[in-house]
Amino acid sequence: MNFEIEFLPVGEASKPGDAIVVRYEGDEGFYLMVIDGGNVDSGKEVVSHIHKHYGEKAIVANAILTHCDADHACGFREILQGLDVRNVWMHLPWLAAPGSLPYFADKNLTAETLAKKLRAEYDLIDEIYGVAVERAMKVFQPFAGQKIGPFTVLSPDKSIYEILLPQFDRTPDADQAALEAAGLWIGKPPGFLAKIADKAVLKAEKWVKETWENERLKDGGKTSATNESSVVLYGDFSSGHRVLLTGDAGHWALLLSVYRAQRSGFPMQQFSFVQIPHHGSRSNVGPTILNQILGPILPKGSGQKFSAYVSAPKDDESHPRRMVLNAFLRRGGSVVATQGAAKCYNVGYPFKPGYKPVSSMPFSDQVEDYD
């Protein structure tokens, strides 16, 4: 099956985002899929890009919002407003209220009250949902096991999403004891002042030497519960071409994706294409999970066995992390970052004007030290 995956440039400086367009061969020519939309401007650029290459009446078979963070969702609204989308896949937090209720600290909350709070707090998601309904698009929630074109959703499972929801940044306080008992306590993300402090540390960042044999990336990184709710997609395009799209998934989501793939009989370590999660953050991956997904570290000079793309602005000081790129290189990846330019991976289709084969980023012998 012919297919192509386009990573469009999104965001500036410390505000990266995602916007991906997938085209794949079908019985009636081809189908289009859009995954996330980045910010408002990038969402408009996705609309223009599709109109330019496929016409003003182009049909998008499926549009998927991986999670509710603004750097993925703001542009998604523009995509639904500007394109003929048939099926929309997005999580609606308020519908998870009944299942999430036991994991909130306030035991006086009712499912109805909680749903109202969630719908009010996640007004952008509600607005996107409203656009989809107004334009007569079918709306589905993407949970593990569902099929979307040539892709299968590996994560999140509906029950896991209900446990993660109380730990989102805009939800009422979580019941930590209940979540620890459920085995999935992550915690709320850091506040605004903590993020400012992190940026100050970044400017004074230390660099350390890294070799092929001495991997400095560590297990145990922690990302937000919202990121852990990201939709992870396993694509099988026949002829041995397998694709893994990860959104902003972290260790939990990736580990659960591995378990789901194993139960479903989907091979790991045999991908042609992998998305590096969360713009190349070291909080989302570690050696153990990468070994499970990609395979072990290869001897230096072994060559490349798959492509690994990452969305990252060209002027972002923290994304992608060099040690993360090195980790993918060690395991056989040809690593490509957008960094202000659209990048395309294709099988069977000719390159669109402006695209050409790209070379892998090199291995870095100096990487960011941990704090």
Where are these regions (language model features)?
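Flexible, acidic/histidine-containing loops and adjacent segments that form or flank the divalent-metal
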Residues: 1-4, 10, 81-242, 329, ...
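Conserved beta-strand hairpin/beta-sheet module of binuclear metal-dependent hydrolase folds
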Residues: 1-57, 226-252
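Active-site metal-binding motif and surrounding structural segment of the metallo-beta-lactamase
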Residues: 28-31, 40-89, 264-283
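Active-site environment of divalent metal-dependent phosphoester hydrolases
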Residues: 40-41, 68-74, 95-98, 146, ...
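Short, surface-exposed basic-aromatic patches at helix termini and helix-loop junctions that form
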Residues: 51-55, 77-87, 259-267, 291-302, ...
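Extended hydrophobic/aromatic segments used for targeting, binding, or gating
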Residues: 244-302, 307-310
